[in-house]
């Protein structure tokens, strides 16, 4: 397991976990508390989620108002473009975003700490995303930022096949507000 902590946004990191292949298929360790502790990450996950999505689905950008959730995100099947936005007001990268392609082929995971908005665009049909959370989901604390907020300027066009007219969103996500409207 290799952990990359040298990203431009502090406290976000990427984990690469090797897949062990044989004639039966493959095995991959998705989380190992002792290995994470060696890298000074003492994380306790309390909820594990699986999300199945069609191609062109865009989920987010979501965050929880009360200290938020840390998330360990991976794409188990298919591929996604995963995006996070730093909403920690005392951070040097406040309101900055980063994106990473996650797929079943690349064996990468991304850890997103509390204080970030998170979302993703589904690149391949029938993609399956897994994320572990450091805090239980609370619908009363959930807030959404619109995916194309002009103050954040996420470059979704960097994704193969992305076309804003093809985006599929939930009714709830269509009502997300801008960062200005939310006073963030």
Task: Go through each PLM region and give its residues.
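Conserved metal-binding segment of the jelly-roll/cupin
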Residues: 102-125
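Non-catalytic, conserved peripheral segments adjacent to functional cores
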Residues: 1-105, 126, 133-184
